[in-house]
Amino acid sequence: MGLSVVILAAGKGSRMNSNKPKVLQTLAAKTLIEHVVSSVEKLNPDNIVVVTGHLKEQVEDALQGRNITFVYQQQQLGTGHAVLQALPYLKEQKVLILYGDVPLISTEVLENLVDTTNDDDLGVLTAFVENPQGLGRIVRDKFGAVTEIVEEKDANDIQRQIKEINTGIYCVHKNLLQKWLPEIKANNVQKEYYLTDIITFAKADHVSINVTHPINEFEILGVNDRTQLASLERVWQRNVAEKIMAKGVSIADPNRFDVRGNLDVGKDCWIDINVIIKGNVKLGNNVVIGANCILKNCIIEDNVRIKSNSMVDGSIIREGAIVGPFARVRPECDVKEGAVIGNFVEAKKTILGKGSKASHLTYLGDSEIGANCNIGAGVITCNYDGVNKHKTVIGDYAFIGSDSQLIAPVNIGQGATVGAGSTIVKDVPADNLAISRARQRHIDTWQRSVKKTDK
């Protein structure tokens, strides 16, 4: 059984007060329309048609690389007119119609609407809400059958009391659309061609109207302004947090937790407040994430502790390692088992060996550090010569004293010691002590300058 999909995305969204179309506002780091497209793609439709209008190039660019046909609605004359523009690009089969600004709609709800709507039926997704203000109302006859959909601006006082609303999501065969769409008239307050008029045509043609409802009310909520966008963001994040907690993870405050990508979790993890997940992140078992941390495209293995105010990006933190507080692990780092990236330590493109420690105030860039090394406070691997990056290699059991600079390319041998305050420009052999600093002198004849006092 084939399926075509039409996504309406021509609106300007003036209440957003933005230079972007409304459907390109973001929720959980994805545009609104990307959320909708992702949901319908799981239905495996034969084709997806997106009707664009305001700033159409931006919408097309945002969806580049997907199997989508774009149709331009030059004049925004209403939803019925928008679907009419898409009609030539649809196959002779059922058509699912929905909006590009309903980001929380689930594949399951759409699938239920499609599956329960026969080829000769009209399927309508409706919902019961406590506050229907601004939404089209579902009008039923005394037998409970749907007779029409009335937009709020065209509704009378009795109709405005109705709590059942139109979600704007329909399923109908192309043959019926070909018959009904040209018959729509703009005889309403807005002087627009409303897609909702197909309900009236269905009744006149004795077409059965199949009504389904969403699993959760929030799934059908649209976005018209930034306040609504912020509210939906919290709904989305709360829903994600609850799914994660159901897998055996404790979250200190689900209202202060953001997933802006995909999070794969083990059991018995603890996530403190204001943690942000970006891209693809995987947590092992018994992981502790402190407050105000940002994790992006990384793997955190079992029993790792990421202390507060730390960032891990594009790296892997091995079992039992500790990061933070106030640490930054940049892309292409591999922090081995039991290693420590301490407070105010930054690492980039670095391997920190098993059991090695850089406990505080250190920069490790383009480095390969062996096992059980000690990197003292204030150590810098100077990897950049102004043109190219160079590598620092430190062998197992090496000890790098505080406030030392290692000028790459340089190798520190296994078991070697670098004295505090040294600037190392040559390789240090294994088990050697390297000291590079001026000899301390005491000058007993020296006198401190004295400031002259005013007479």
Swiss-Prot record:
The biological pathway it contributes to is:
Nucleotide-sugar biosynthesis; UDP-N-acetyl-alpha-D-glucosamine biosynthesis; N-acetyl-alpha-D-glucosamine 1-phosphate from alpha-D-glucosamine 6-phosphate (route II): step 2/2; Nucleotide-sugar biosynthesis; UDP-N-acetyl-alpha-D-glucosamine biosynthesis; UDP-N-acetyl-alpha-D-glucosamine from N-acetyl-alpha-D-glucosamine 1-phosphate: step 1/1; Bacterial outer membrane biogenesis; LPS lipid A biosynthesis
Active site (UniProt): 360
- Show the segment(s) annotated as N-acetyltransferase: 248-455
- The residues listed in the UniProt record as binding acetyl-CoA, with positions renumbered to this chain, are 377, 383-384, 402, 420, 437
Q: Which reaction does it catalyse?
A: alpha-D-glucosamine 1-phosphate + acetyl-CoA = N-acetyl-alpha-D-glucosamine 1-phosphate + CoA + H(+); N-acetyl-alpha-D-glucosamine 1-phosphate + UTP + H(+) = UDP-N-acetyl-alpha-D-glucosamine + diphosphate
Top-level taxon: Bacteria
In the record's cofactor note, how is the cofactor described as bound? Answer: Binds 1 Mg(2+) ion per subunit.
Query: Which N-terminal stretch is annotated as signal sequence?
Result: none
EC category name: transferase
Which of this chain's residues are annotated to bind UDP-N-acetyl-alpha-D-glucosamine?
8-11, 22, 73, 78-79, 99-101, 136, 151, 166, 224, 330, 348, 363, 374
**Which CDD domains does the record match to this protein?**
GT2_GlmU_N_bac (cd02540), LbH_GlmU_C (cd03353)
Q: Mind naming one GO cellular-component term on file for this protein?
A: membrane
Q: Would the keyword Repeat be found if you checked this record's keyword annotation?
A: yes
Record keywords: Acyltransferase, Cell shape, Cell wall biogenesis/degradation, Cytoplasm, Magnesium, Metal-binding, Multifunctional enzyme, Nucleotidyltransferase, Peptidoglycan synthesis, Repeat, Transferase
| The protein's role, per its UniProt record | Catalyzes the last two sequential reactions in the de novo biosynthetic pathway for UDP-N-acetylglucosamine (UDP-GlcNAc). The C-terminal domain catalyzes the transfer of acetyl group from acetyl coenzyme A to glucosamine-1-phosphate (GlcN-1-P) to produce N-acetylglucosamine-1-phosphate (GlcNAc-1-P), which is converted into UDP-GlcNAc by the transfer of uridine 5-monophosphate (from uridine 5-triphosphate), a reaction catalyzed by the N-terminal domain.
HAMAP family to which the protein is assigned, alphabetical: GlmU
Assembly and interaction partners: Homotrimer.
What family does the entry list?
Answer: In the N-terminal section; belongs to the N-acetylglucosamine-1-phosphate uridyltransferase family.
The protein in question is named: Bifunctional protein GlmU
Question: Lineage in the entry?
Answer: Bacteria, Pseudomonadati, Pseudomonadota, Gammaproteobacteria, Thiotrichales
